[in-house]
C-alpha cells in the first residue's frame, strides 16, 4: 500500500460518479485541457467536433446511456474526469491544466479499471496523450486515424482480471 504524506493526502482528490449538476464543470475541464494540449495540432473541424462532444448537453445525454463518468473532486471543485463507454472503451480522460502532474489522471484511470466489463479496454488517444497511455499499460493498435478532424491513435490493453467475467446470479 502506498503511503502518502499529510500534504499529499490533502491534495488527493475524491473520485466519485458524476452527477447532472457536475456537467458544466466536466465540460469546462475537458475544454480547458483540450484547448491547451490538443487543439493547437488540429484543424478547425477537429476543434469543432470536440467542442460538440464535450458540450454540457452531450455529457448529459451520455450520462443517461451506458456510459460511466467519474469525476475527481478537490476542495469541492471538479478537477478531472474519466468516461467509460459501454464498459469497454475509455472515451475521455482529462484533468484541469492547473492540476496536472499531481497523479489525478492516474487516479481516475485506476478508479475506472474495475468498472471495465470486457477483457480488453480500448482508447482512441490524442497523439500527445500516447506516452501517458503507454505508461498505463496500453499498446498501439494500428495506424494513426482521423475522424471528423480529430486525429487519434487506437490503443488497447488487457482490462482488470475480473473484467468480462460472469457477474453471477442477479
Pin down the residues of each PLM region.
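Conserved N-terminal entry element of GNAT/NAT acetyltransferase domains
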Residues: 1-21, 161-170
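Conserved GNAT-fold acetyl-CoA-binding loop/helix
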Residues: 31-58
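A short helix-loop-beta-strand connector motif used in the catalytic cores of GNAT acetyltransferases and
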Residues: 55-71, 89
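Conserved beta-hairpin
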Residues: 67-80, 85
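Conserved acetyl-CoA binding element of GNAT-fold acetyltransferases
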Residues: 85-97
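Conserved acetyl-CoA-binding loop-helix of GNAT-fold acetyltransferases
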Residues: 97, 101-114
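Conserved active-site alpha-helix within GNAT-family acetyltransferase domains
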Residues: 106, 127-151
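Conserved GNAT acetyl-CoA-binding A-motif
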Residues: 115-128
